[in-house]
Design a protein with these regions (language model features):
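Bacterial N-terminal signal peptides
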Residues: 4-20
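A short beta-strand-loop structural module common to alpha/beta enzyme folds
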Residues: 60-70
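Helix-loop-strand module that forms the ligand-binding subsite of alpha/beta enzymes
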Residues: 69-155
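Boundary at the C-terminal end of the N-terminal hydrophobic targeting segment
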Residues: 20-26
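Short helix-loop-beta junction
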Residues: 48-61, 146-147, 151
Length: 200
């Protein structure tokens, strides 16, 4: 399994290489999109990479792809948009993703300033069964974002992008990857609009 690409190696094709740590001051016009996920089987990681591809397709974006356990406070607070993916565990987000959200305060101190306020947020999920809890999982992710006063958007589906990994279509199929790319693109487009508006 390939290791996740560190911030900010994934860039739009036209963008210049930036330092190892993100520097939005050095690239004030860039919109930073963080795609983060938990994956054991590789299915959610595959979706995450497609989400990142979609975000990367929007001109003016700087995209990072990281596992939730590798995200730092700097990654989180330097981003303009955050897209979180999880496998379905008992019709909910995985424990690793829940810990990631808990760490926003326990490790990174988002309160009382609401440091994630007005950042764009979105969710994606993978699950074995067609009705095994993917929408519920995405809604729990979005609820955590709303609790932090983020601006949540959809794309690829009503609540985000999802994939059914068992049955007639094991793994991730092309339609599900296309939905993941749509989600990434939608989030990046909204983040660009918001950042442009904030400068006016």
């Amino acid at each position: 399994m390939a290791l996740p690409v560190p911030w900010p190696v994934i860039l739009c094709a036209w963008a210049l290489a930036l330092p190892a740590a993100p520097s939005l001051a050095a690239a004030p016009d860039a919109v930073a999109v963080l795609v983060t996920y938990h994956s054991l089987s590789g299915n959610t990681e595959k979706m995450a990479r497609a989400v990142a591809e979609g975000a990367q397709s929007v001109p003016g974006t700087l995209v990072a792809l990281k596992r939730v356990g590798d995200v730092t406070g700097n990654d989180l607070f330097s981003s303009d948009a955050l897209i979180v993916g999880s496998p379905v565990y008992w019709s909910n987000m995985s424990g690793e993703v829940k810990t990631f959200f808990d760490n926003w305060q326990l490790k990174f101190g988002v309160f009382p300033e609401f440091k994630m306020r007005n950042k764009v947020g979105a969710a994606f999920a993978t699950g074995g069964q067609a009705s095994g809890g993917k929408e519920v999982t995405m809604l729990t992710i979005l609820a955590a974002m709303l609790g932090n006063q983020m601006i949540v958007v959809s794309g690829g589906g009503a609540f985000g992008a999802s994939a059914t990994t068992e049955g007639d279509s094991p793994g991730i199929d092309d339609k599900e990857l296309a939905a993941a790319r749509d989600l990434g693109r939608r989030v990046a487009e909204v983040a660009v609009l918001i950042k442009r508006g904030a400068r006016k």
